Amino acid sequence: MRQLFKIFSSKEKENLWAIKLYKKLWKTTLSDVSVGNLVARLVTLFFKDGEPFDCIEINYGEKEYCSIKSLLLDEKRLSSRKVSHISCLNSQSGEELVISFYKKGEEYGSVLLEVILVSSSLNLIEVSGSIRIAKDLVSVASWDYAYGFMVSKGLDVRTESKIRKCLFSTSVSVSKTYIERMKKLHSIHLGYVPQLYPFNMLNKKQMENIPSESKLYSQYYLDSRLYVLLCN
């Protein structure tokens, strides 16, 4: 079964890298996440302009904002228990910051935090640049998993599928494979790895589960929890 959802139209992303980050949360610890601080830190570290976005919305259009500053001032709405999705886009450059909370089950016992970065400041070609970015990322939060790739023309970063252009809008199809993958990402702490990308931040369990030939790629010990695996 395939579903369609509407997306922002923007300039084609050229020479941009994307990084997706994941953190496993629980209902009892969800309130510990400061969404405002997360947004502020990511914008400061990975976007050159202090106000890099012209399309900002929360919870799929529940409210729109004219700037990051106005978003951060809305502290009540930024509660991690009230936020399910934040989307920030630069319609000219194609740069993006997307934050999503995926709640598993009606009781919301398990929550997966996903952050998507698309920025011209992400240089994942050089080893030194990749390690620097990895260190910056772990200074923001204790991630459980992350990966990065270059955005090809016509690719929707969220679903990693091709964008369909219609007469007056654009859309992407959400496949059953994508839906199943998002469910399995709740098991990253148990070693689940969807696939290897040019840039990977893996936890210890994931390192144990990757194919043996992957051990030939460049590996770097990042901290007590994570490794960087480069497959360029």
PLM regions: where:
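C-terminal interaction module
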Residues: 1-54, 156-232
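Internal, hydrophobic cores of structured domains that mediate oligomerization or house catalytic pockets
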Residues: 49-162
